[in-house]
Swiss-Prot record:
This is Elongation factor G 1. SUPFAM superfamilies: EF-G C-terminal domain-like, P-loop containing nucleoside triphosphate hydrolases, Ribosomal protein S5 domain 2-like, Translation proteins. The keyword Nucleotide-binding applies. Catalyzes the GTP-dependent ribosomal translocation step during translation elongation. During this step, the ribosome changes from the pre-translocational (PRE) to the post-translocational (POST) state as the newly formed A-site-bound peptidyl-tRNA and P-site-bound deacylated tRNA move to the P and E sites, respectively. Catalyzes the coordinated movement of the two tRNA molecules, the mRNA and conformational changes in the ribosome. GO terms for cellular component: cytosol. Residues 8-290 form the tr-type G domain. It is found in: Cytoplasm.
Length: 698
């Protein structure tokens, strides 16, 4: 089967933004103008096509990245048909992982800003993630019809706060209630969209006389930015003072793809103005899969290899998202980098080293699907029937093995206990948590050995709220949720020698176990080290292992406050036994008793997780942020210059002091600072705090 759309006419783009910039509305309008949805879905009606989980429609925020394929020929049908694969990404800080994995597989992005609130903390986070993956992008300043909207002010913030080089390709005509349309600075014409047909048709008009001077000034900036693309263009510009429309567009495209400039457009998605021009700009200025560098990976001999966006190269693709679908089970979203694969073909998961077979392949339109027979280089689609694939795995041609760069996922930091409300919920909860953990690499599930409770951990409180909510809605599991907890641990700092004796002798068969242990710290990270130093058979061989088991059980149950003990070395060096009364059980209990007594004599301490915290803040708020970290027992480890005059503070802070930090940081810096945190190490809890925890649990 031949390719329907040549790869040069593909655009794989993400639409990213801060929570309320109007990103989902923008995507809805794109689907409307490209003919995919006949009735526009409004977010505030809870009907937006891209927000397809119930939680998203209720909360009015986007949680998962829905992927959609659409086609566009231009506002004036001036292009051949282009295929645009769009990924709508969430804007909330707890879901940054979703944004990260989308950016990893995109070729370009449209970053949406609100014309009133401009650059917000999450937009800074998204921008830094796009920088990390080198994603070329353009900007759409939305909500120009809102009170206080100011396009050029937002362009200024993009320059100063994000350290970017924005080049406006439009100016707004009027703002707030007076917002009428835009001036196209390349054509030097005004564009007015027809409100009667929801902006499906438009007219070019002369630029309003009172705006001509401003338009000419920004037009000059635009042409200068284009001229800087090459020496030839610069010479032509200096001689003629002008460049042709074709030259301007080619130069701006090249500089956008090289990440040297960011083109800026404006409009109001809600009022159906400007989105059509953004689609044209996506086609004219953002890269096709062949415009971006070939993806790098390693082959089965550990040599580095490249895969180009070419149907004739061996098949290679990256699984960037797993979703559970009520009708077909598991959907694996993949981005194809090279080659072709048909439904029914065998592929190789090079990360897991397993063969998989592609069952059906579907192209997603939000959560509706069309079945297709094959996917080719540059495609984004979902496969049904893959058995053991997780986010970040490479799927490739079994005869040409490659592992593409894996995505890195942060360690979860916050933990809550969940308990099923009934016996029926118990079984369903296990299945539900397993499926949710497969979908989301930043979410983990474990069982607390002492209490038997199920603990779930994730990136933040909203993250875990949504998980609990999805268990109820999608899997019908009712559960009670505990308060967020810190995972403390225990260890020892000193040495001791102790005797453990368990004797029960009162007529008939008794119990007799007797051991001497030497207890001391092990190397960090070693866990439990057991040394058998028994000589001359004072304890028979069959009773040695039970002693180790008894010690290990006591370690899991803790000695101070019931938290597991880490990094201890126990040497069994003496003891005695009884011919009749000794048993495995008796020695297990003796070992456990000796360890508890010995650990309490060996300077036991409580450990807490320290988090590596990185805060990006404008200089004005630096003193407040550092003062607050000191109050939270934080240790400042250093400071760096960030982009656009921001400061980056590196610190280590106990997790117990970080609950509610996102809210506190927002209010302390008027929402200008952002932070990330990940687990660093376990460290001793200060005595006064440890005593309180031990008193509570002991």
């Amino acid at each position: 089967m031949a390719r329907k759309t040549p790869i040069e006419r593909y655009r794989n783009i993400g639409i990213c933004a801060h929570v309320d910039a109007g990103k989902t509305t923008t995507t809805e309008r794109i689907l409307f103008y490209t003919g995919l949805s006949h009735k526009i879905g409004e977010v505030h009606d809870g009907a937006a096509t891209m927000d397809w989980m119930v939680q998203e429609q209720e909360r009015g925020i986007t949680i998962t990245s829905a992927a959609t394929t659409t086609f566009w020929r231009g506002m004036e049908a001036q292009f051949q048909e282009h295929r645009i694969n769009i990924i709508d990404t969430p804007g909330h800080v707890d879901f940054t992982i979703e944004v990260e994995r989308s950016l990893r597989v995109l070729d370009g992005a449209v970053v949406v800003f609100c014309g009133t609130s401009g650059v917000e903390p999450q937009s800074e986070t998204v921008w830094r993630q796009a920088d990390k993956y080198g994603v070329p992008r353009m900007v759409f300043v939305n909500k120009m019809d809102r009170a206080g909207a100011d396009f050029l002010r937002v362009v200024g913030q993009i320059k100063h706060r994000l350290g970017a080089n924005p080049v406006p390709i439009q100016l707004n005509i009027g703002a707030e209630e007076e917002f009428k349309g835009v001036i196209d600075l390349i054509k030097m014409k005004a564009i007015n969209w027809n409100e009667a047909d929801q902006g499906m048709s438009f007219t070019y008009e002369e630029i309003p006389a009172d705006m001509l001077e401003l338009a000419q000034e920004w037009r000059n900036h635009l042409v200068e930015a284009a001229a800087e693309a090459s020496e030839e263009l610069m010479e032509k510009y200096l001689e003629d003072g002008e460049l042709s429309e074709v030259e301007i567009k080619q130069a701006l495209r090249q500089r956008t793809i090289n990440n040297e400039i960011v083109l800026a457009a404006c409009g109001s998605a809600f009022k159906n103005k400007g989105v059509q021009a953004v689609l044209d700009a996506v086609i004219e200025f953002l890269p096709s899969p062949t415009d971006v560098p070939a993806i790098k990976g390693i082959d089965d001999r550990e040599n580095s290899v490249e895969r180009h966006a070419d149907d004739n190269e061996p098949f290679s693709s990256l699984a960037f998202k797993i979703a559970t679908d009520p009708f077909v089970g598991s959907l694996t979203f993949i981005r194809v980098y090279s080659g072709v694969v048909n439904s029914g073909d065998a592929v190789y998961n090079s990360v897991k080293q397993k063969k998989e077979r592609f069952g059906r392949i579907v192209q997603m339109h939000a959560n509706k699907r069309d079945e297709i027979k094959e996917i080719r280089a540059g495609d984004i689609a979902a496969a049904i029937g893959l058995k053991d694939v997780t986010t970040g795995d490479t799927l490739c041609d079994p005869n040409h093995v490659v592992i593409l760069e894996r995505m890195e996922f942060p360690e979860p930091v916050i933990q809550i206990a969940v308990e099923p409300r009934s016996k029926a919920d118990q079984e369903k909860m296990g299945i539900a948590l397993g499926k949710l953990a497969a979908e989301d690499p930043s979410f983990r599930v474990e069982t607390d050995a002492e209490t038997g409770q199920t603990l779930i951990s994730g990136m933040g409180e909203l993250h875990l709220d949504i998980i609990v909510d999805r268990m109820k809605r999608e899997f019908g599991v009712d559960c009670n949720v505990g308060k967020p907890q810190v995972a403390y641990r225990e260890t020892i700092r000193g040495k001791s020698e102790v005797e453990g004796k368990f004797v029960r002798q009162s007529g008939g068969r008794g119990q007799y176990g007797h051991v001497w242990l030497k207890i001391e710290p092990a190397e960090p990270g070693q866990g439990f080290v057991f040394v058998d130093a028994i000589a001359g058979g004072v304890i028979p061989k069959e009773f040695i292992n039970p002693v180790a088991k008894g010690i290990e059980e006591q370690m899991n149950n803790g000695v101070l406050a019931g938290y597991p003990v880490l990094d201890v070395k126990a040497t069994l060096f003496d003891g005695s036994f009884h011919d009749v009364d000794s048993s495995e059980m008796a020695f297990k209990i003796a070992g456990s008793m000796a360890f508890k007594k010995g650990a309490l004599e060996a300077q036991p301490v409580l450990l807490e997780p320290l988090m590596k915290v990185e805060i990006t803040t404008p200089e004005d708020w630096m003193g407040d942020v550092v003062g607050d970290l000191n109050r939270r027992r934080g240790i400042i480890e250093g400071m760096d210059e960030g982009p656009a005059g921001l400061k980056i503070i590196h610190a280590k802070v106990p997790l117990s002091e970080m609950f509610g930090y996102a809210t506190d940081l927002r209010s302390a810096t008027q929402g200008r600072a952002s932070y990330s945190m990940e687990f660093a190490e376990y460290a001793d809890v200060p005595k006064n705090i440890a005593d309180a925890i031990i008193a509570e649990h002991g």
